[in-house]
């Protein structure tokens, strides 16, 4: 059996991380790869398009009902979806109570003990990335995920989150084998978005793996709780996800140790590639009317 690839998709909330990851993994499955998805986002939406479900029961909620995680069996928590993709959601506590990362730690340990990673080509962790706290950094910290793919856009907060995630990778890169596989730009139609994403990737000592164009067919598929690969397999957008999947498949061993940048450097990038072609500190804090 080929060696197991453990990858993770990180990105700020609302960036389209779960949608991008599920479509990409569906494409990998179509290529004959055996996939296990481990959802590490408290929203528990990392598998809905694969399972055609609103939200999968999480390991933490099932453990609470059963008494403890030791009372669960693998078949209790794992569901099989499109292209035989196996799906698990770690879950998290009620809002305002406890650490959301606890579910990630509990779930990964349980899955390993139960042999969930056997006969698998890819394990994919779908992780919230606004805050790289200890729990959410678990796949990185414990040397589980070897390749991190950051879903971002040309918007400032998405880039800020990508830089923060890179800091988390850097912290554990030397003690473990984790590497930044690359950035995936989920287009938001901001000015000079492709150039900006490419420039940020270069600053982070990485590369832009793929620029995913915006297409309403993604939302049409989501309303039916389906990936584009299943909903419209011959569409141009399905082809984009297949291209992305191929690039990730060919990217084994090509990850890098990232070089995060400062906030000033990030703002400079935005000014160079965004709405303001010239960096002019005198314009900071002035309205559009005054600036004109």
Swiss-Prot record:
> Coiled-coil regions in this chain?
none
Query: Which SUPFAM superfamilies does this one have?
Result: P-loop containing nucleoside triphosphate hydrolases
Question: Which Gene3D superfamilies has this protein been placed in?
Answer: P-loop containing nucleotide triphosphate hydrolases (3.40.50.300)
Q: What is this protein called?
A: Nitrogenase iron protein
Q: Which residues cross the membrane?
A: none
> Which reaction is catalysed here?
N2 + 8 reduced [2Fe-2S]-[ferredoxin] + 16 ATP + 16 H2O = H2 + 8 oxidized [2Fe-2S]-[ferredoxin] + 2 NH4(+) + 16 ADP + 16 phosphate + 6 H(+)
Q: Which gene encodes it?
A: nifH
A single GO BP: nitrogen fixation
Q: Which InterPro entries match?
A: NifH/chlL_CS, NifH/frxC, Nitrogenase_Fe_NifH, P-loop_NTPase
- In short, the EC number is 1.18.6.1
Q: How is the cofactor bound?
A: Binds 1 [4Fe-4S] cluster per dimer.
